[in-house]
Amino acid sequence: MSCFHEEQRFGRWVWAVLVIISVPVVVAAIGVAGRDPAALAAILVGPIVVAVITALFAVAKLVTDVDDRGVHVSFHLLWPTRHIPLEDVQRAHATEYSPLVDYGGWGVRLSWKGWAFNTGGAEGVLVETKSGKRIMIGSRRANELEAAIAKAIAARSA
């Protein structure tokens, strides 16, 4: 039984970044292809890669669930589900953070602070395990996520 469920997608800022990156790639490919038509197939690799990455971001979503077994975090199509058993949770608390400064960006990140799963925003729940691992879960409903984890742990202990 799930006591918390949240789905998040990347915001408009991702699309702006992808457009900023893709326009020069496409323009460069067209410019080079105009000078050497035989190289067209090789040159199209750049725009195709950009299109595939854009498509992945379009369908990718961060899904967070809390149930009687634990916390489950997944980036559909981009990363396998991360399962954190309730018995491994030492502490979970809602907090503000900077995805770029604290974890080096958005998506699935590993930094000296631990793992992060986020699509944007500056709020999340930091889950600290009994083994010392730290997992930041970005959430637009951080207080609800924190409460759901606490409730699931309490229900398991009862």
Give residue spans per PLM region.
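Hydrophobic alpha-helical transmembrane segments
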Residues: 36-48
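Generic signal for short, ordered secondary-structure residues
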Residues: 46, 50, 68-69, 106, ...
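N-terminal membrane-targeting/pre-transmembrane regions
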Residues: 1-37, 116-117, 131-134, 140-147, ...
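A residue-level signal for beta-strand positions that form part of recognition/binding surfaces
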Residues: 1, 63, 124
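Conserved beta-hairpin
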Residues: 49-91
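Non-transmembrane, membrane-adjacent beta-strand/coil modules in membrane-associated proteins
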Residues: 74-140
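Hydrophobic alpha-helical transmembrane segments of multipass integral membrane proteins
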Residues: 19-26, 46-54
